[in-house]
Structure formats: structure tokens, C-alpha cells
């Protein structure tokens, strides 16, 4: 075992030990009710009278995994396949093609399962995701016997497209993207209270269909960077989620359903050092049918610490109404796979503390040769510098033009060509002056 690997294992051991100690104390306090009571008292002023007036509430339930562990403060971070629910502009700036499976479940019966995929071609990104929320439904008659059973479910499909405009070496571009989404709410049939017989299509009448869209913007640049990397360390993101309508009453009279949980979000992500990032989000819900009945704003904050290049810890908090959500998790990378486990004490959806766990596995399919192309451009650029220092300006320009064939907005190559051309012109002037004497 190498010294470096030993140090990595030592770091992970102490982090897991501290993590388990904190989690054990936190869960014990939560079970005794002390944490819940203290939180309710502290945040009681934030009670929202307009909460839960919208339909398709599962749209507010995150996929789970790393983004939820960071308090769902992911509008600006959005650096993996989880971006679908936070900022649709992110697919065009992701380095790798990714696919992921998420299982987000309460320590009860409810669960959310998600499959997502994203790919990038040049400055264009695209992807798709399928998410299903489900909870067992059992109806009992007046005698206590089971009359019907099934699952209440809400299933959402999303199709993403984004493009990074004006992307270059210095200016990283303006990423714009959208998700086109459709959701279906499935309600099982229920029985007649008098006869006990199942009423045909009774569930269909209460089922619903929604059509909606998300729009996002992502800006990336450098501010107060304390480490060396070509990647920017500061992101700003803006997004609008779930703008659309829903319908219900199928089988009878189709009518508009309650408004969708539309909201606007703004966020920042700041990587102070290479192994530490902080994120923050602000969200403002909008009731599109009656803006006066919109829910109150919410805020979230999160952090991620990369203990080693294959192990990271996350933590975050979401304050929405009087009941916040506190979460923490860990990620482990192994070859092309990345695993995440997250625990949340979720008070946002219940007056009682809800213990929620999520598991995620992500597969990295590589960057489709982008790194090789980048290394080729870097090599050509350095060769051009070598020619320039030797006074062979024409050869330097040739090399830098080859760089621009690979990356048309490679700013150092453009600047080098301009400098070399000026040097050629200056040398010509000097020779012309020398000829006069």
C-alpha cells in the first residue's frame, strides 16, 4: 500500500467516523422530538398560508443523491445529470456523457424513482429523464375489510436541449436551455360505499395530465480563484420551472386542474479552493392562476468537500415555510461509476419529522474525445510559442491557425497571431529603415 493511498484511507475513515457520530446524535434527537420542536419554534414565523395550493406536488420532490444532499441549492452548480430539476441550461457545459439511476424513499411507503441521461455534442447539450413518484393506496370499507388497492402515482417525462453561446477560452459563454415536460397523475379506482363494488373509471376522473416547460440560464467565470484550473470557479444560474397547465376529469368533463408548482430560482456556486464549494439558491413560487396566492419564497444553501479525488461529503439546508429540510450525504467514485447516499430530515411536507433516504448511481461514459482534442490544441499552441521565441513568426502563426481550426474561439491563439503579425510588421519596418542607411 502506497503512502498516498494510506493517507486517503485515513482521511475517509475519520470522515466516516465523524459523519456516523453526528448522524447518530442527530437521529436520536429527532426521534425524541427535540430537534423537531426546536425547529418549529425557531421558524414558526415563516408559516405560509398559501402552501399546498398547487397540483402535481411531486414536481417539488428532488431526484435525490448529491444535489439533495447539498440542500437542493443546485441552480448554479448543476454539474452533473441531476441538472434536469434545477437548471436546464447545464447540459451544454457538462464534460462527460452521463446516465444515472436515483431511488429516493421515505422511511414509510412513498418513493421516487428516476432514470436520467445526458450527452453533449460540441456546444449543444441534450438529454432525457423519467421520474415516477408512487405510494401504495388501500381502501377499506365500513366493516374494515379491504375494498380496493393500487398505487397513487405521478410520472414525469422531461426532454432537454441547451446551447452554450459565444463559448471560448476566456469567456466561457452564455448557456441557455429548456426542458419540455409532461406529467400524468394516476389515481386507482375506488369502491362504492354502499355496495362495495369497484366504480369503473372512478380513478380516471381524478387523474390528471400536465404539460409544462423549464427555462434556464447559466454563466460561469472566475472570481477570487485560489487554485490553478481551466474550469471557472464561480457560477450564476437562473431558471423558471414548471410553467404550464394541467387538466383533470377524464372520462367525464375535462377541466383545468389546480395550478402547477411554478417557480423562479436564482443561485450561485463558489469554489473557493479546488476541494471546497459553497452553493446558495433563492426560489420564488408563482401561482399562475392567481399570483396573489403564490407561496412564499424559499432559500437553500449547501456545501461539498472533496476529501480525496474519489470520496466527497455534502451537507445542506432548505428553508421553505416554517419547516426546513436538513440533509447530508457522501459520494464514492469507482472507475466509471459514482455512488451517493443521502439522508434528509424532511419537514417541508409534513408536520411530523420525515426521515428520507436516497441512493444514486451514476455512470460516466467519457467525454467523447474532447480532452484529447484539447490536449492536441494545447500542444499546437505551445509549439507556436516555441517558434515565436525563436523568431520564426510565420511558423508560429501556422501552428496557432491549426489551433483555431480545432477551437475557433481559443483566445490565446488569436492573441498570439496578432502579436506575431505585429512582430513581422515591426521587423519589416526595422529592415526598411536599415536599407536607408
Roles of regions detected by a PLM:
Residues 2-16:
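Bacterial N-terminal signal peptides that target proteins for export
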Residues 15-24:
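Bacterial N-terminal signal peptides
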Residues 25-29:
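Sec/Tat signal peptide C-region and signal peptidase I cleavage site
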Residues 30-68, 111-112, 116, 120-405, ...:
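Outer-membrane beta-barrel porins/channels
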Residues 72-74, 97-108:
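Short strand-turn segments of transmembrane beta-barrel domains in outer membranes
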Residues 82-91:
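N-terminal periplasmic accessory domains that precede
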Amino acid at each position: 500500500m502506497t503512502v498516498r493511498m494510506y493517507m486517503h484511507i485515513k482521511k475517509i475513515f475519520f470522515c466516516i467516523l465523524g459523519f456516523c457520530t453526528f448522524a447518530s446524535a442527530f437521529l436520536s434527537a429527532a426521534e425524541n422530538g427535540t430537534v423537531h420542536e426546536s425547529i418549529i419554534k425557531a421558524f414558526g414565523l415563516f408559516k405560509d398560508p398559501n402552501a399546498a395550493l398547487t397540483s402535481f406536488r411531486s414536481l417539488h420532490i428532488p431526484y435525490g443523491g448529491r444535489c439533495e444532499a447539498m440542500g437542493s441549492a443546485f441552480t448554479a452548480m448543476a454539474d452533473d445529470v441531476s441538472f434536469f430539476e434545477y437548471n436546464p441550461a447545464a447540459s451544454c457545459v457538462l464534460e462527460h456523457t452521463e446516465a444515472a439511476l436515483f431511488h429516493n424513499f421515505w422511511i414509510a411507503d412513498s418513493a421516487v424513482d428516476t432514470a436520467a441521461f445526458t450527452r453533449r455534442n460540441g456546444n449543444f447539450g441534450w438529454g432525457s429523464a423519467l421520474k415516477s413518484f408512487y405510494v401504495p393506496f388501500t381502501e377499506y370499507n365500513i366493516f374494515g375489510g379491504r375494498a380496493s388497492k393500487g398505487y397513487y402515482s405521478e410520472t414525469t417525462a422531461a426532454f432537454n436541449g441547451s446551447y452554450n453561446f459565444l463559448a471560448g477560452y476566456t469567456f466561457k459563454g452564455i448557456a441557455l436551455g429548456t426542458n419540455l415536460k409532461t406529467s400524468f397523475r394516476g389515481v386507482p379506482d375506488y369502491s362504492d360505499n354502499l355496495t362495495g363494488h369497484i366504480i369503473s373509471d372512478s380513478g380516471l376522473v381524478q387523474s390528471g395530465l400536465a404539460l409544462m416547460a423549464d427555462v434556464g440560464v447559466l454563466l460561469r467565470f472566475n472570481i477570487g480563484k485560489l487554485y490553478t484550473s481551466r474550469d471557472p470557479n464561480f457560477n450564476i444560474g437562473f431558471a423558471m420551472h414548471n410553467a404550464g397547465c394541467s387538466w383533470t376529469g377524464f372520462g367525464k368533463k375535462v377541466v383545468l386542474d389546480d395550478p402547477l408548482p411554478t417557480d423562479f430560482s436564482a443561485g450561485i456556486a463558489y469554489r473557493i479552493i479546488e476541494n471546497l464549494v459553497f452553493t446558495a439558491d433563492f426560489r420564488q413560487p408563482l401561482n399562475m392562476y392567481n399570483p396573489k396566492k403564490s407561496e412564499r419564497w424559499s432559500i437553500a444553501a449547501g456545501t461539498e468537500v472533496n476529501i480525496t479525488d474519489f470520496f466527497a461529503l455534502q451537507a445542506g439546508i432548505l428553508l421553505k415555510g416554517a419547516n426546513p429540510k436538513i440533509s447530508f450525504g457522501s459520494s464514492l467514485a469507482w472507475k466509471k461509476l459514482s455512488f451517493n447516499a443521502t439522508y434528509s430530515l424532511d419537514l417541508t411536507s409534513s408536520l411530523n419529522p420525515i426521515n428520507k433516504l436516497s441512493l444514486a448511481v451514476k455512470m460516466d461514459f467519457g467525454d467523447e474525445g474532447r480532452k484529447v482534442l484539447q490536449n492536441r490544441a494545447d500542444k499546437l499552441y505551445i509549439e507556436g510559442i516555441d517558434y515565436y521565441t525563436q523568431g520564426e513568426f510565420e511558423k508560429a502563426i501556422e501552428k496557432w491557425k491549426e489551433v483555431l481550426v480545432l477551437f475557433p474561439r481559443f483566445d490565446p491563439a488569436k492573441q498570439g497571431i496578432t502579436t506575431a503579425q505585429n512582430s513581422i510588421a515591426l521587423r519589416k519596418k526595422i529592415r526598411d529603415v536599415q536599407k536607408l542607411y
